[in-house]
Amino acid sequence: MAAAFRRGCRVLRSVSHFECRTQHSKAAHKQEPGLGFSFELTEQQKEFQATARKFAREEIIPVAPEYDKSGEYPFPLIKRAWELGLINAHIPESCGGLGLGTFDACLITEELAYGCTGVQTAIEANSLGQMPVILAGNDQQKKKYLGRMTEQPMMCAYCVTEPSAGSDVAAIKTKAEKKGDEYVINGQKMWITNGGKANWYFLLARSNPDPKVPASKAFTGFIVEADTPGIHIGKKELNMGQRCSDTRGIAFEDVRVPKENVLIGEGAGFKIAMGAFDRTRPTVAAGAVGLAQRALDEATKYALDRKTFGKLLVEHQGVSFLLAEMAMKVELARLSYQRAAWEVDSGRRNTYYASIAKAFAGDIANQLATDAVQIFGGYGFNTEYPVEKLMRDAKIYQIYEGTAQIQRLIIAREHIEKYKN
């Protein structure tokens, strides 16, 4: 019965998505001269957003503090999100998914992050792990590895970062040596989200040992089953924030991977790995906006309740101005991720906008979390109140999926290139 319900839910939401895209297309052709574009969501997008919002507020927020304290993996919440169609929604319809675009996925992500970014990151790691397969997998690979994700609440992971290769992806040392119809992989990965929970990994390894070969041709992307002999999963890391998310190191010792699990072909891995970021960075930015919105809401609620010097905090100009600045920032950050998502859904290269969204939203999340703690005063520094968790959770948005500094390098490069042309 549960399986039948799941299938029915998939069909219903697939129809909704088709209608959503159709309405979007029709609206574009019916616009009045000079209107340009609309900020209005379609009814289907509002439904996705409302479903995610209800789930976050009613099911995530009440238990988020306990998951933060225990560090326990939030599988019950992930399973529920899967049942609601809030996870893996971008998997193509041909593989049993909903085939949602990046914009729709961002709407869902922002709402989930409002509830808890640890839970949202565990879910979002699936998107990053799956994206190389969505972009570069053949039909057989997609049906095998993406299809199974729609039949059961499974997880996957993106295995690229290493102990000495974070932002400098080209410094990866994990090696893949071809032997007959297999590749033998040796190396170590680090800071892998869902590392201990994944059913399979996207793994980037150097397949050409010649250091003179450019990164664009030196690396190969593989799909690796998590239970393959030779894979050793490290302990769960205790991080500053987003503690319920599963982060680990993974060692690969003579791991044999069939050639059928190579994405596109030998040497194509670097471009695949980097191309995935154009589609996942907008959703990371959306997660940061969700946290920022939560910080603003918590600070506003507190300022409307707390009294000092005989009047409400919000009646003090200094506090009201701070809230105004917070509101300005969260709205602008939201627009940045929506532009980046809209660009890629429109079929255009969005590297420039994706990096702007990721960098700006990550910075704003940290600023607003800090401002919320400031408005709470001493209470904000205490674990009995929600904003200290927001402050801890926010920092990683300036680090993972490309640091704030790397985003600025990308933005500068893209900007200068645009100016020259």
Swiss-Prot record:
Disruption phenotype annotation? Mice lacking Mcad show increased neonatal mortality. They display hypothermia and cold intolerance upon fasting. Their serum and bile acylcarnitine profile is also different from wild-type mice, with an elevation of serum decenoylcarnitine compared to wild-type mice. They also display hepatic steatosis following fast periods. They develop significantly elevated concentrations of urinary adipic, suberic, and sebacic acids and hexanoylglycine.
What are the N6-succinyllysine sites (modified residues) in this protein? K30, K69, K179, K212, K217, K235, K259, K271
- Tell me which residues bear Phosphothreonine: T351
Checking CDD domains in the record gives:
MCAD
InterPro entries in the record, alphabetically? Acyl-CoA_dehydrogenase, Acyl-CoA_DH_CS, Acyl-CoA_Oxase/DH_mid-dom, Acyl-CoA_Oxase/DH_mid-dom_sf, AcylCo_DH-like_C, AcylCo_DH/oxidase_C, AcylCoA_DH/ox_N, AcylCoA_DH/ox_N_sf
* Modification sites for N6-acetyllysine: K30, K69, K79, K212, K217, K235, K259, K271, K301
**Domain of life of the organism encoding this protein:** Eukaryota
Q: Which cofactor does it need?
A: FAD
Described function: Medium-chain specific acyl-CoA dehydrogenase is one of the acyl-CoA dehydrogenases that catalyze the first step of mitochondrial fatty acid beta-oxidation, an aerobic process breaking down fatty acids into acetyl-CoA and allowing the production of energy from fats.
What protein name applies here? Medium-chain specific acyl-CoA dehydrogenase, mitochondrial
Give the organism the record lists. Answer: Mus musculus (Mouse)
Its organism's taxonomic lineage begins at:
Eukaryota, Metazoa, Chordata, Craniata, Vertebrata
